[in-house]
């Protein structure tokens, strides 16, 4: 088995059971459900699990229900189960705000990750500032570097033997390296960065705030370095940038840098892991993509539909009558991509993964004004990763004496994926 030299060690997943808050008095008892993304069947770390498929159970119920414990800190949320209704929420920032201070709350603070947790009009200003950095044209300019890094890692795996842990040896080193390259940094601290992200997104109540403080210190130190000696990288761009004819404040630079850090590390690696896990279990689909690699782009979209990793939560800014449901100001509203993407009203036979599916209106990258800023880069990383893997690794399968461990929660993922091609 590949020793994974240079690859970050994967830690055992810690999934705390959220402590549920009481159900608000305005929630009718018949609208309270027992499903949540943390402790329902398939959500806890599960060998050979499929947490996205497990979410489909909600489609047997009402279009909206109240889950008393559906956030990492045990907050209750309304759960929107229909893709069409999720789109209504996600494109209505006037009624449903994005400002939650997810990261800052780990420190007992309240400041936004930018632009993710901003509402109009401020959101539009920062989005316009940042869009060119992750435009299709800019992503194409990174294509050579993305492909070279992917090929390097896979060739190293192939040279080491006929088995590897994809998450440790490929998915995370690949995604983190591209993130570091975008920041203008070397990958000398790759293992450190993965550890921070793991503690922040999946750690306990001690690890999370410690990781948050470490990430903030890193972002602040990098900003100070670039102020003193700017180079051609993302942080230097933020230092030079102007909004409303003024430079960005320290808090705005921090909020933007933190978002890039959090968003750039875990989700792409998880997507690659879920994709290769699927192909390892479905040799006919694996063979199809080997015979016709031109299908990989379309297949990647179907795999994004089937295996998204995040839920978007909005906060009601006012009392809303949502098709007769009494959403009150301050209520949390969950729009989970893994629920919308298994909606039978939106997709024909949604539990079946069809790599030839066309007109794929999935919401893996969210929807509306907050559609993922880095979606173009993420897509290229996933497609290139699959192309190079299938080109360089013979037909593969899950190693017989192992079981990939999947999990739901704040960000869905796969802890380990040991493949074999002997």
Regions found by a protein language model. Name each.
Residues 5-422:
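Cytochrome P450
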């Amino acid at each position: 088995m590949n020793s994974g030299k240079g690859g970050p060690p994967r830690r055992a997943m810690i999934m705390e059971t959220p402590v549920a808050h009481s159900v608000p008095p305005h929630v009718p008892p018949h609208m309270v459900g027992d499903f949540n993304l943390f402790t329902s069947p398939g959500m806890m770390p599960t060998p050979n699990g499929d947490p996205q498929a497990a979410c489909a159970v909600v489609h047997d119920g009402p279009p909206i229900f109240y889950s008393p414990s559906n956030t990492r800190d045990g907050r209750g949320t309304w759960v929107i189960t229909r893709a069409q209704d999720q789109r209504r929420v996600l494109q209505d920032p006037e009624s449903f705000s994005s400002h939650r201070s997810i990261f800052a709350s780990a420190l007992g603070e309240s400041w936004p990750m930018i632009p993710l947790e901003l509402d109009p009009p401020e959101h539009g200003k920062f989005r316009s500032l940042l869009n060119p950095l992750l435009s299709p044209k800019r992503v194409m300019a990174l294509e050579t570097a993305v492909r070279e890094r992917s090929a390097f890692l896979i060739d190293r795996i192939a040279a080491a033997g006929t088995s590897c842990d994809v998450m440790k040896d490929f998915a995370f080193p690949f995604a983190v390296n591209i993130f570091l390259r975008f920041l203008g940094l070397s990958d000398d601290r790759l293992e450190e960065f993965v550890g921070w992200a793991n503690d922040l997104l999946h750690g306990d109540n001690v690890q999370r705030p410690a990781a948050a403080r470490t990430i903030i210190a890193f972002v602040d130190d990098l900003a100070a370095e670039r102020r003193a000696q700017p180079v051609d990288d993302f942080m230097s761009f933020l230092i030079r940038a102007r909004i409303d004819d003024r430079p960005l404040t320290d808090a705005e630079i921090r909020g933007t840098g933190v978002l890039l850090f959090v968003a750039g590390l875990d989700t792409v690696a998880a997507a690659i892991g879920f994709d290769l896990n699927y192909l390892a279990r479905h040799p006919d689909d694996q063979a199809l993509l080997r015979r016709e690699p031109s299908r990989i782009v379309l297949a990647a979209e179907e795999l994004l539909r089937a295996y998204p990793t995040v839920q978007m939560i909005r906060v009601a800014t006012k009392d809303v009558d949502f098709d007769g449901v009494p959403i009150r100001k301050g209520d949390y509203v969950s729009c989970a991509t893994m629920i919308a993407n298994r909606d039978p009203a939106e997709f024909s036979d949604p539990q079946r993964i069809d790599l030839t599916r066309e007109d794929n209106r999935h919401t893996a990258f969210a929807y509306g004004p907050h559609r993922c800023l880095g979606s173009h880069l993420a897509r290229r990383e996933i497609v290139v990763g699959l192309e190079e893997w299938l080109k360089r690794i013979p037909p593969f399968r899950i190693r017989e004496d192992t079981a990939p461990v999947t999990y739901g929660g704040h960000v869905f993922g796969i802890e380990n994926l040991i493949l074999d091609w002997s």
